[in-house]
């Protein structure tokens, strides 16, 4: 035994005492918790004394309860009543008209109307998985740009929106006709694969989801570059990764747009990820010089307290009202005019079997090149960029 130290038996005895005290504390915590769940009128005199003797535990448990309730409220969807929403839209329309440089940030909420589930909403993928429910999604190739996507494109055409920064990988901004120079797809695009061996990187736009075989830190798609023969990779930025590609992420343009913006409109984003990108919020500027923030979302966001206006409504509903207020017609999406068909690089001979995803086609009846008859209806989510997002949560659960 070292001088001044404890013997092995003394250390064991001290450890037993420590564990006993911890167990006694846990039991007392359980007792206090059970008592607090009772109405004050139903508590016995002995229970009242126990609460009085356990002020610290009572304070701790009440704090936990308040935090749980706060988190629950944040997850709830709230809708403004029609009159309130209309009033807010008029205020938003005034901001859009008067903005010198308006940037739009978009999230999964603008694509739910296209049957692409979000992650965090009440019917979102992670929410359902946490409840132990199965998750399915319609074939993503069946998704089409929503009213919100088409409205944003029209606003850009009218020079009311200067740039769009999107978290979505679904390619619907591209397919709505928004110029690629006017958008930054921070987390990639499911229709684009690139050759990083070429300088500058060579892009291949496809008419199918290129992410079928890719995953976190494993981005090769199995196809090769037509010029140098190098392996092609997808452009998706998975949870836990840092995007390094120039396009379609276009971080340089996103950062420049944010620095110029005097107004930012956030549509359908929880902002839980975007808030971590400081360059998008100009927080180094004094408050008076930061862009005014307008948020459209049904749930709480961490930027609500910074917003000049928060609109609780579905994106399509708000954008319909906004476009009416601005006197602008919303263009209809047409598959025949979808830009992806003119941008796409066809597969070479021998590459037709390199994927099993359903290809986009100008007519719904027309089979896409290289198709293997993927189902059109809802099906369990398997692989690809969306499926990988789902497994982020399912892997946390142990299968017994």
From Swiss-Prot:
GO terms assigned for molecular function: chromatin binding; histone H3K18 deacetylase activity, NAD-dependent; metal ion binding; NAD+ binding; NAD-dependent protein lysine deacetylase activity; NAD-dependent protein-lysine depropionylase activity; protein-glutaryllysine deglutarylase activity; protein-succinyllysine desuccinylase activity
Positions carrying Omega-N-methylarginine: 388
Activation/inhibition comment: NAD-dependent protein-lysine deacetylase and deacylase activities are activated by nucleic acids. Histone deacetylase activity is activated by DNA. Protein-lysine deacylase activity is activated by RNA. H3K18Ac histone deacetylase activity is inhibited by methylation at Arg-388. H3K18Ac histone deacetylase activity is inhibited by deubiquitination by USP7.
Pfam families given in the database record: SIR2
Residues holding Zn(2+): 195, 198, 225, 228
Active site positions, chain numbering: 187
Keywords: Chromatin regulator, Chromosome, Cytoplasm, DNA damage, DNA repair, Metal-binding, Methylation, NAD, Nucleus, Phosphoprotein, Repressor, Transcription, Transcription regulation, Transferase, Ubl conjugation, Zinc
The UniProt record lists the keyword DNA repair: yes
Signal peptide: none
UniProt region (Disordered), positions on chain: 1-28, 354-380
PTM text: Phosphorylated during mitosis.
Modified residues (Asymmetric dimethylarginine): 388
Subunit structure: Interacts with UBTF and the RNA polymerase I complex. Interacts with components of the B-WICH complex, such as MYBBP1A, SMARCA5/SNF2H and BAZ1B/WSTF. Interacts with ELK4, leading to stabilization at target promoters for H3K18Ac deacetylation. Interacts with histone H2A and/or histone H2B. Interacts with DNMT1. Interacts with SIRT1.
Similarity comment: family membership: Belongs to the sirtuin family. Class IV subfamily.
Known function: NAD-dependent protein-lysine deacylase that can act both as a deacetylase or deacylase (desuccinylase, depropionylase, deglutarylase and dedecanoylase), depending on the context. Specifically mediates deacetylation of histone H3 at 'Lys-18' (H3K18Ac). In contrast to other histone deacetylases, displays strong preference for a specific histone mark, H3K18Ac, directly linked to control of gene expression. H3K18Ac is mainly present around the transcription start site of genes and has been linked to activation of nuclear hormone receptors; SIRT7 thereby acts as a transcription repressor.
The protein, known as: NAD-dependent protein deacetylase sirtuin-7
């Amino acid at each position: 035994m070292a001088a001044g130290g404890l013997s092995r038996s003394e250390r064991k005895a001290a450890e037993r005492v420590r564990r006993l005290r911890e167990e006694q504390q846990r039991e007392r915590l359980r007792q206090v918790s059970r008592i607090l769940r009772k109405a004050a009128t139903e508590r016995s005199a002995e229970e009242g004394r126990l609460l009085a003797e356990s002020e610290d535990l009572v304070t701790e448990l009440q704090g936990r309860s308040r935090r749980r309730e706060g988190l629950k409220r944040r997850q709830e969807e709230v809708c403004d009543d029609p009159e309130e929403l209309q009033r807010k839209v008029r205020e938003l329309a005034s901001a859009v008209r008067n903005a010198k440089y308006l940037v739009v940030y978009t999230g999964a909420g603008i694509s739910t109307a296209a049957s692409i589930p979000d992650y965090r909403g009440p019917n979102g993928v992670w929410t359902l998985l946490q409840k132990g429910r199965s998750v399915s999604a319609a074939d993503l190739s069946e998704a089409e740009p929503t009213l919100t996507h088409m409205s944003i494109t029209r606003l850009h055409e009218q020079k009311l929106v200067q740039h769009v920064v999107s978290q979505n990988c679904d390619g619907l901004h591209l397919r709505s006709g928004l110029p690629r120079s006017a958008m930054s797809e921070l987390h990639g695009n499911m229709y684009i694969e690139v050759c990083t061996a070429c300088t500058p990187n060579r892009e291949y736009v496809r008419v199918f989801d290129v992410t079928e075989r890719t995953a976190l830190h494993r981005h090769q798609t199995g196809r090769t570059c037509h010029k140098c023969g190098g392996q092609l990779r997808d452009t998706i930025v998975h949870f836990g990764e840092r995007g390094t590609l120039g396009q379609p992420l276009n971080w340089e343009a996103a950062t420049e747009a944010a620095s110029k913006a005097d107004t930012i409109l956030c549509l359908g984003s929880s902002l839980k990820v975007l808030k971590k990108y400081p360059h998008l919020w100009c927080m180094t500027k004094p408050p008076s010089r930061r862009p005014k923030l307008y948020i459209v979302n049904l749930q709480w966001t961490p930027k609500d307290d910074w917003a000049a206006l928060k609109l609780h409504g579905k994106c399509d509903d708000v954008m319909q009202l906004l476009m009416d207020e601005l006197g602008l017609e919303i263009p209809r999406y047409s598959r025949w005019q979808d830009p992806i068909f003119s941008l796409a690089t066809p597969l070479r001979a021998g590459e037709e079997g390199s994927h099993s995803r359903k290809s986009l086609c100008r007519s719904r009846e027309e089979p896409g090149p290289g198709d293997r008859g993927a189902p059109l209806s809802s099906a369990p989510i398997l692989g690809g960029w969306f499926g990988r997002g789902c497994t982020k949560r399912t892997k946390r659960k142990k299968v017994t």
